[in-house]
Amino acid sequence: MRWIQESGFYRGTGDKMIRPAIIGWREWVGLPELQRAPLLSKIDTGAWSNTLHAADIEIIESRPESRIRFRLEEEGGWVERPIQRWRRIRDSGGHETLRPVIRTTIEIASRDFDIEVCLADRSTLKHRMILGRNFLRLGFIVNPSRQCIHTMIRSEERIEMGSMD
């Protein structure tokens, strides 16, 4: 049974209650199935879906499932994942594109989630990953005056992919 308390402060399934985490307009996230270093992600309340930068995208048609092969960085190693589905995305200019969707684990604010992520070439954009409203529904509130509220503890050095600050 899924419910939301009237005050909006708690969300839960069955007996488990989760207090929403406050996050900034951008946060460090972990993508343990895709790369080792944390990634600086923009929280985009104007977007519905999540999008991750992918370079050199190749579709591998096979049975029973199609797969996608891509790089997270131009010089990085290859990543291969099953394609969950294709999603039609409309950008702010009204242009529609069809994007492949994969599932992966994301770590943020000391929590892990299995999420869907659209893949697209974001090499010319400031942030290599955006998290949209469907992600925020998992139990997050955005404080637009703050950034990087939650740290990622990793032995590897942090990499701010694509940031032009």
Predicted regions: what is each one?
Residues R2-W3, G8-D165:
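Pepsin/retropepsin-fold aspartyl endopeptidases
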